[in-house]
A protein has these predicted regions:
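N-terminal binding-site loop/beta-alpha segment at the start of enzyme catalytic domains
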Residues: 1-79, 137
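A cross-family glycoside hydrolase active-site/sugar-binding cleft signature
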Residues: 17, 51-53, 82-84, 114-117, ...
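Active-site mouth loops of central-metabolism enzymes
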Residues: 19-34, 83-93, 120-123
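Proline-centered loop/turn at the N-terminus of a beta-strand
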Residues: 78-80, 142-143
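Glycine/proline-rich, positively charged
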Residues: 89-159
Length: 159
């Protein structure tokens, strides 16, 4: 697996997207065996970056990613785990709670990258970013960012 270093962070060039792992918008436990097989196989062939979200299968994707990581031969430090907070959880306390819930489902002490999954309507991004920065200071998140933001909104969110 090829890697790239960006600002002192070394990342695999290809990651495993866990959308549909464990279901679609709600958990589908009938898929657990196939989902875990896919995740374990990915780990065995060298995948080290896993991307999930609290929205994927209503958090069940995070549970399965965490389970696959725990039973793998890989050390947590060798992996890069990304998860995302939904737009409905972007108030300060909601961001903190959403991250705690994600960490609980993953059964991990921290995530490498925590993203705002989608822009939200009427969201005060300053409040969301204050919470995200607190998570970084507290060691629960190593890096933060956004997903699915158009450039104009990204610039507005930085104001």
């Amino acid at each position: 697996m090829k890697h790239e270093t960006i600002n002192s962070i070394t990342l695999p060039k290809i990651g495993f997207g866990a959308w549909r792992i464990g279901g679609n918008s709600s958990p589908d436990h009938a898929l657990d065996s196939k989902s875990l097989t896919a995740l374990r196989s990915a780990l065995e062939v060298g995948y080290a970056h896993f991307d999930t979200a609290e929205k994927y299968a209503d958090g069940h994707s995070e549970e399965l990613v965490g389970e696959a990581v725990r039973v793998s031969a890989k050390k947590r430090e060798e992996l890069f785990i990304t998860t995302k907070v939904t737009p409905s959880h972007l108030k300060y306390d909601d961001v903190l709670k959403a991250c705690e819930n994600s960490l609980r489902r993953l059964k991990m002490d921290y995530v490498d990258l925590y993203l705002i999954h989608w822009p939200g309507t009427g969201v005060k991004y300053e409040e969301a970013f204050r919470a995200l920065n607190k998570l970084v200071r507290d060691g629960k998140v190593r890096h933060l960012g956004v997903s699915n933001f158009k450039l104009k909104l990204l610039k507005q969110s930085q104001e």
